[in-house]
C-alpha cells in the first residue's frame, strides 16, 4: 500500500516524515539536510530553484527569490499586515483581480499557493527518492490559528503540487502527537507553545488513555498568524538599517540587493546570539554613493537584540492566557510545556515561557522536526498502520452568519471539537421578502464587519409572507480539516442552497486546475532538464577517459584506430553543445563502441604478453640449483628449565 507522508509546510523551513513500522522517520533531502528552506527562486534561464539552492543565490537575485510566502497565503492585499510586509521584502507583492495578495515574478503574477506548491513538490520528491515509489497522498500541517481561507489555500497548494491532501492538521496538535506517541504514563495536560518563522500558536492538549486508545484532545487553541521569527528578523533589520542611515544618510530599504544581504546577516546574527553574548554584523560594500563604497559594521549584543524583540515575545503571552481560560484551566494544572518552532531556541523566549507557566519547558522534543513527525503519525492513523491513536482537534475561531443590524450570530463557538455540525432557524427581516443572503463569518467580534468574511450565497424563491414567518434553517458543517460547508433551507418549500465555503477571495476551481497543469508541465520540463544534464555529464566523462586512454596508449594504437576515436570524440563534443537528446545518445553510443573495441584489443594484447612473460619466469625458476635459497645457521637448544 502506498505511503501517506507527513509534511510540515513552514514559513522559514519545511520538513517531511513518514512512518516506518511503528517509528516515524524524518527524511533527508538531496542535500543531506533534514529541513528544507521554504524559499523558491526563478532564474533568468527559466529554472525554478527550491530550498538551499534558492537560498544560496538570494543575494544576487533578490527580486525573484520568494521567501516567507506562507505569511501571504489566504490573505487580502489590503490587509494592514500585508501592507507592512510589502515595505520589508525585496520581491514585489501585488493585488490580484480577486483582491488577494499575490507576487509578481518576471512579469508573471503568481498566487501564494502556487509558490508553496513548489516547496511541497520538493518535499514530495524527497520522500519519493527515499521510499523508491511514487507518493500521491499527504497530511499537511497548518498553524492552529489559520482561518478557513488559509486552510483552503494550503489544500490548493497540495493539489497544485500533485498531492491529495488527506488531512490538514494543526501544527501544535501534530507536535503533541510526536511528543505523546511513546508516552504511556496515563493522563496528562500539555501546553504546546509553537513560535515558528511566521506564526504563533498555543494549544492546550489533554493526552489520555481511553479504552486502550491513546486519545489526544485539544481543549483550546489561540495564536497570531502574523507573529514569528520573520518578525524578529525584521526588527533587527530595521535597527541595522536605521543605524546605517544615521552614519551614512543612506536608506538601505531602497536597495533590494542590500536588503537581501541585510536579511541574511540579521538571521545569522539572531541565531548566533542564542549561544553567544555578542556578535559583529559585518557587511563590506553594502552600497555606494558619489563618495565611494560604504561598509556596514555594527557590534550587536544579546541584550540589544532582546530589547528589540521584547515586545514581540510579550505578544505571545496574551494568547496563552486566553487559551488557558478557554480550556478552563490554571497554569498549575499544566503538566508539561513543549516548545516547537525554531524561534523557541532564543533564550529570551524560553525564559518568558518558563516564567509564565512556572516550569521549565521540555528539551526532548526537536522544535524543527516535531510537527512533521506528528503529521507522519496522523498519516499512519489514516492509512490504518497505527490503530491506537485518536485525535480530537478543534476549530480555532467562532463561525456564524450576519443577522439584522450587522450583528454576527454564532452557530459554532471557537474551540469546538471537529468534525461538528450545528443548525439554527432564522427568518426574514421584511414583509414579503422572497430571498435571503447568507453571509458567512469567522471571528470573535459581535460586529459582523469586524470579522473575516468567508463568503455569501442567496436562498431565493421564498414564498411571500409577513416578516418573521418564513423559517430558514441554516446548517454549518465542519469537516476534520476544519473546512466549512454551509447550507440553507426554506422549511416551507424544502428549497435548499449550499456551498463549500470558498472565500470571496481564494482560487477558483478553474484557477487551481490551470495551476496543476502548469506545475505538471514544469515537472516534465524539470525531468527533461535533469535527463539532459545527466546525459551531458556521461558524455563529458567518456570524452575525458577516452582522451586520457589515447594519450597513455599512443604507441599501442594504429592510425586508423586513433582517427576513428578522434572523430567520435569530436562529433560527441559537437552534439553535447546542442539540445538534440537523440543525437547525443547516438554519438555517445558510437564513442562507447569505439572505446570498448580499443580497450578489448589492448587488454587481449597485454594478456598474451603477460602469459609469455609468466612462462619464461617459470622455466628460469625450474633450472635453479636446489641449494639456492638454503641458509646455514647456528642455533642453541633451549632447555625446559630455561624457559621459566
UniProtKB/Swiss-Prot annotation:
Pfam families: HSP70. SUPFAM superfamilies: Actin-like ATPase domain, Heat shock protein 70kD (HSP70), C-terminal subdomain, Heat shock protein 70kD (HSP70), peptide-binding domain. GO terms for molecular function: ATP binding; ATP-dependent protein folding chaperone; unfolded protein binding. Induction: By stress conditions e.g. heat shock. Residues 609-623 have a biased composition (Polar residues). Belongs to the heat shock protein 70 family. This is Chaperone protein DnaK.
